[in-house]
Amino acid sequence: MGIVFEGVADGGSPVAVKVVTTELSQDEVFVRRFQREVAAAQKIQHPHVVPVLDAGESGGLPYLVQELIPGGSLHERIESAGQLDLATTVRLLAGPAEGIDALHGSGLVHRDIKPANILLDGDRAYVTDFGLAKDSQASNLTRPGQALGSLDYMAPEQIRGEDVSAATDIYALGCVIHECLTGTPPFGGRPSMRVLFAHLQEAPPDISEARPDVNAATAKAINRALEKEPEDRPASAAAYVKSVLKAATA
């Protein structure tokens, strides 16, 4: 949300500067979401969440400054590799899963967990981009029935515009694991309306069919996050990733 520039802080360290464009700065709802992103990110102090270093307004344009993570995104890693092995997937996502749980512990739901919002520095990974984050204690900036998020990673309740919860982010994390292992989200490669319908109605694909090196127990553990009902998904993101690792090493 906005344009991101690379900059240099007063002390000489590289930073990422996210600026709302002139056009979007006239959109009151967008600006309020941007301000909410700042407030949400500033609430979280976690080693796997990209911190906000500064925020303000310049020339009428709101901005925020974050630590620059130099290794690109998980999306770029998947695009380059095609697929990741299970060990790499779990290693990369274990930290962000803890960061996601930290968000939830602060009353936040990210609502846009996807590979592009997981940044890498070697094998260390970070959650970023809180532009759609929902504070359970704050007023809602969306209309009833309005869905916000990225289509390939949206939980059924999110598509329906219903209340979101920690389980919504866990669903998205399950979609991310699918993409890491197969190169595509579970219902990817279809027209938009078919993707929506699949999230709402279809059982997720069995990863072991596309990846014979992933055993049936692990495939089942991965798909627990993609249950249609939020209460049927794992209780936390970190516990979910650990359950996948446990199934793989049993």
Language-model regions: role of each:
Residues 96-108:
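Protein kinase catalytic-loop region centered on the HRD/HxD motif
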Residues 59-73, 77:
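Conserved short submotifs of the Hanks-type protein kinase catalytic core
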Residues 92-93:
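Activation segment signature within eukaryotic-like protein kinase domains
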Residues 55:
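Activation-segment/catalytic-loop signature of the eukaryotic protein kinase fold
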Residues 21-43:
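AlphaC helix of the eukaryotic protein kinase fold
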Residues 182-186:
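Structural helix C-cap motif within protein kinase domains
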